[in-house]
Amino acid sequence: DYGCYNNRGRTPPYFNAIERELLGKKPARLTMNAELRLEPIHKTGFFFRVDTSNDGEYYLLEARDGVGWDSHIGGEGMLVYHIDKSQNIAGQIQASVRWDINKVNSYSLHECADLVEALPNAVNVKQVFFPGVGKVDKFATLTDPHFVDWEMRGVGVKFDDIKIEP
């Protein structure tokens, strides 16, 4: 296990959206559908947040281009994280408490910082990126994976025509 390092433990990736948020960087909040361009996070530090109707539960979205420190991450495209810091019960304790006691993902049935794989049964890191090798160019309430909160309610935003532009 190389932890968060790639390239057999020799190369750290750039900080991701979760780490940047924990360090105090504020994401741009998306509240409606629009045509957007998301630059690689290492170039601008820019990432999006989409809130659910449940306070403290939201999604973070970032772009990776697989260059520089990210040359060993195994892919490129948009990454999506489902974050839960709410009052939801996640294995007998509240999700917000899991963050306080450093047990964020220790309950596998309700991870509180979950990478949403573009291909839900991904077995290879290349399959987690949107559109990625699976050419998954949509992310919405009724797509698979679903863009919903833990109660299966849609978030009110959808992404169509996800693509990587040169």
What are the residue ranges of the model-derived segments?
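Post-HExxH zinc-binding segment in Zn-dependent metallohydrolases
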Residues: 1-25
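Non-catalytic C-terminal accessory/binding modules of secreted extracellular proteins
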Residues: 28-166
